[in-house]
């Protein structure tokens, strides 16, 4: 099954539903930064996201410096943003709470 990139309308709807995420036009990706009280909380969040990512075979591009986690989502197989990224962003939002 091939993964298709979002249409312009689907992308706009997804961005409306994910107001804290920024669209990166150059990479056809979405990104968000999360800040936590300390490194342990940031790392615990990353662990929850990693378990979700592994279960769904869809992995973020991310970095961590102390209490901050930066996440970028795009689907390389689709050549840009796909429904998999939107689903992962929604899951990440829930995991951050």
UniProtKB/Swiss-Prot annotation:
It catalyses: (4aS,6R)-4a-hydroxy-L-erythro-5,6,7,8-tetrahydrobiopterin = (6R)-L-erythro-6,7-dihydrobiopterin + H2O. The keyword Cytoplasm does not apply. One of its GO terms (molecular function) is 4-alpha-hydroxytetrahydrobiopterin dehydratase activity. Its EC number is 4.2.1.96. The keyword Plastid does not apply. Disulfide bonds: none annotated. It holds the Pfam family Pterin_4a. Keywords: Lyase. Gene3D superfamilies: Transcriptional coactivator/pterin dehydratase (3.30.1360.20). Belongs to the pterin-4-alpha-carbinolamine dehydratase family. This is Putative pterin-4-alpha-carbinolamine dehydratase. It comes from Rhizorhabdus wittichii (strain DSM 6014 / CCUG 31198 / JCM 15750 / NBRC 105917 / EY 4224 / RW1).
